Amino acid sequence: QRREDITNMRFSDIYDDRLHVRQIKTGMMIAIPLSLSLPVAGLRLGTVVERCRLVSRGDYLISAGIRKNSPDGSIHPDGLTKKFVAARKFTGIQFSENPPTFHEIRSLAGRLYKETCGEEFAQRLLGHTSEKTTKMYLDEREKTYLLL
């Protein structure tokens, strides 16, 4: 999901064993099963939600904590991006001129789910209505030149 969707996810949006997401950009409504897993990454949505529950101080899955500038505990999407950049730097991994962005997590997840669950599933998970958009989105990060 997009960073705006992630920062808007709430525990109260979880019912019937699904995380219900209304995508902010498109308005697309998807209900993701908590049993959804991505074996290559060793992740299961329900486990991730439980980890969030352990540290969140409010209804938001990703919480800044209750503070003066965030009375409900929400975090701004830019704050999420800044924390991602800090975590990326903390790894000590040396990247090229263009290190991966937070948004590229979405693209990578789409490609991995395409491999494990098929392109139609990836398209629905991404919330795309157009197959063309999904195909473009699932294209590899590094483009290569066509040699003539």
Regions found by a protein language model. Give the residues of each.
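Catalytic-site neighborhood detector that most strongly recognizes the C-terminal catalytic loop/helix
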Residues: Q23-G27, E119, L126-L148
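Helix N-cap/coil-helix junction residues
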Residues: Q1, I93-F95, H128
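C-terminal catalytic core of Y-nucleophile DNA break-rejoin enzymes
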Residues: T26-E50, S56-A86
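Short, basic (Lys/Arg/His-rich) helix/loop patches that form interaction surfaces
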Residues: T81-R124
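Short, charged phosphate-coordinating catalytic segments
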Residues: Q1-D17
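Key DNA-contacting residues within the recognition helix of helix-turn-helix
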Residues: T7, R111, T134-K135
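Short hydrophobic/aromatic-rich beta-strand segments that constitute the beta-sheet cores
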Residues: L19-V21
